UniProtKB/Swiss-Prot annotation:
GO terms for biological process: ribosome biogenesis. Mg(2+) binds at S175, T195. One of its GO terms (molecular function) is GTPase activity. An essential GTPase which binds GTP, GDP and possibly (p)ppGpp with moderate affinity, with high nucleotide exchange rates and a fairly low GTP hydrolysis rate. Plays a role in control of the cell cycle, stress response, ribosome biogenesis and in those bacteria that undergo differentiation, in morphogenesis control. Its EC number is 3.6.5.-. This is GTPase Obg. It is an enzyme of class 3 (hydrolase). Keywords: Cytoplasm, GTP-binding, Hydrolase, Magnesium, Metal-binding, Nucleotide-binding. InterPro entries: G_OBG, GTP-bd, GTP-bd_Obg/CgtA, GTP1-OBG_CS, GTP1_OBG_dom, GTP1_OBG_dom_sf, OBG_GTPase, P-loop_NTPase. Monomer. Gene3D superfamilies: GTP1/OBG domain, P-loop containing nucleotide triphosphate hydrolases. Its cofactor is Mg(2+). GTP binds at residues 168-175, 193-197, 215-218, 285-288, 316-318.
Amino acid sequence: MKFVDMTNITVIAGNGGNGCVSFQKSGRRASFLKKPNGSNGGNGGDVWLLADPNINTLNYFHSNCVFRAGHGQSGRSRGCTGKRGKDVIVKVPWGTRVSYKKTNKLLGDMGIHHKRLMVAKGGRHGLGNGHFKSSLHYCKVLNTNGSTGEFQHLLLELLLIANVGIFGLPNSGKSSFIRIISSAKPKVADYPFTTLVPYLGVVQINNYDRFIIADIPGIIKGASHGLGLGMRFLKHLEHCQILLHFIDIAPVDNSDPLENIITIQHELSNYNENLVRKPCWLIFNKIDLLEQQVAEKRINHVISSLKWKGRYYSISSIHNTNVLSLCNSIMKFIMHHTHS
């Protein structure tokens, strides 16, 4: 099934019902004295978005893109108010960003700022002539019509909700890592871009503690100008509490790990400077491919050259080296920052 994380929908609220014009005979001179008793119409139905944690893609909206609420009924005689139009509730994944398509103005992040959000308000009811009656039972203004409901074109963007986000160059071992520690099963192979869509995995530390981790396709130089796959999916890192930058310590193309880190950080900054400000750990992967002293020398060179003040870890996803220790550190970090 195709992974859909961006789509357009149209929402149409219901129109308000018209007010009723009717008269009740009053007294003996019924032909001259008529008491207005027409009632108001009903309000039009609203269109709401509802964040549902059980939905994880926008695939449904690929073939369902127009949502209409019910119209309010017109008022009737003898004080019978028109029935309100039926609301429409549209379920979207937790973490869906909602914007106006034309202006890109943000309406809200579902599940982050809003669990329930009105995106199109129904039209107001019209007034019946009973609303305008006077003490003389004379009505100059007979009635008013209901107003038209709102009509909106919306852009829905899904931002995956994860505690931890993984990024790096293609073939840095991200997918192997997430396969080992979680229930997610991304494709793993010895060629670039084996990860074509984001993956979510749940990492169970013990019976009580767990975290959610997101793996996005690899980022390459020039990604901020449209090259590669990863830039489109960087938005899925925006809600993460911590980022893990995976580095291949022994690249098969003999590229410099230091230059690779600088390249990726530059692309991240071009996309969104707020991502660069997030807590980030360097994860030096594939240490099994080098002798211990060589690996340590390369890592120390990178750390000193970058003047890196954050945490860093050396692991081997294939041999499970230091993986458990890293996961425990991640869990402690999340718990500390969640409750602080």
